[in-house]
């Protein structure tokens, strides 16, 4: 790919329904998340549900800055998609209904062309196609520079609630669930290993400037209040370029 083609691919928007962002539960690695978002960025407003999306290993390497290691990118992509096929995606539909599905219906690998063909689960159609209202979009490049899986998930969530107001209050348990960090029982561990690194990357690479305050019930921290404003994009763009071109 030319530098221009790489830049254009990175500048594509990821668009998802807010319900999917705010109510989904899954356990994916950083690179598995990037692969999913990379594929979502390929959806255009004119695509019909059931559309197949094809990408080459070389394209994924260059756009997402996957470190090339002796031609192993093909195996890395294969392994990621294999893992994705075993990790369910849960979406809370109503108080009494939960959808359990996967991101993709099928993955077809073509060794002759070194490409992969994917199509999204039909159950995700309402959250990915023909979006008119109550959806969130962001530039793919904003998450490609991130090195923490928690950064990606927190950024998605904060983008989806940004228009609700300058401040956003969320319980600690719900925040851990949104970030996939339920394994941190102690707040200190969660703050040091998940929340702080995520906010550092969000404030370095994205279009959001985020601060927070801890809220207590008695002596125990039980909620986080985020302050979310638009960031100075030119400086963030330079930070992303440095990270992606290392």
How does the language model describe each region?
Residues 1-246:
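Charged, alpha-helix-forming regions
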